[in-house]
Amino acid sequence: MSEFDAQRVAERIDIVLDILVADDYHSAIHNLEILKAELLRQVAESTPDIPKAPWEI
């Protein structure tokens, strides 16, 4: 995802819910992990470099 789009995130969450209804927990978890990584990467790209606390290294 190139920019945060609440509608797109909602659609992807809906897909994960459909996968859960189908009892495919492994795929649902995998899809959530991918979505989380994409969102975290996007936030990291859009925020200035802030020094990390020692426990975040």
From Swiss-Prot:
InterPro entries: UPF0509 (IPR020887)
Disulphides: none
Highest taxon in the source lineage: Bacteria
Entry's family note: Belongs to the UPF0509 family.
HAMAP family cross-referenced by the UniProt entry: UPF0509
Protein name as annotated: UPF0509 protein YciZ
Organism for this UniProt entry: Escherichia coli O157:H7
Lineage: Bacteria, Pseudomonadati, Pseudomonadota, Gammaproteobacteria, Enterobacterales
